[in-house]
Amino acid sequence: MKRLITLVFLMVFALTGGAFAADTVKIGVYLPLTGQMAFGGQLELEGVQMAHKEMPTILGKKVELFVVDNKSDKVEAANAVKRLIEKEKVVAIIGTYGSSLAMAGGEVAEKAKVPMVGTSCTNPLVTQGKKF
């Protein structure tokens, strides 16, 4: 799991090219921390936090994580991604556990052209036709 999350971080950083002008790289993380999928979301959060502890900087820039609970709900997942993009101004997003939640949040990220990497999505529709 640690290697997977580290790989995800590297992929996100590669996709965010111009985002390295600031001293801090803001990465959003949206996971089901409550609700029926909370167990999987908690495990993924532990993996993301472990990878962040191992790699708190990239190319000399501090990595700051913004974690949001999508409450195991598709509407909340879309709202969480919107909040990460509009309020927190993240340059990339990691998440989420649950393909249906990833598809809901993915639509928002795609429209905003913010790269998003799913850590455990299994449905091919999550990435089908997506550039970000």
Question: Where is each model-derived feature located?
Answer:
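Extracytoplasmic "Venus flytrap"
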Residues: G28-G47, M55, V68-V75, Y97-S100
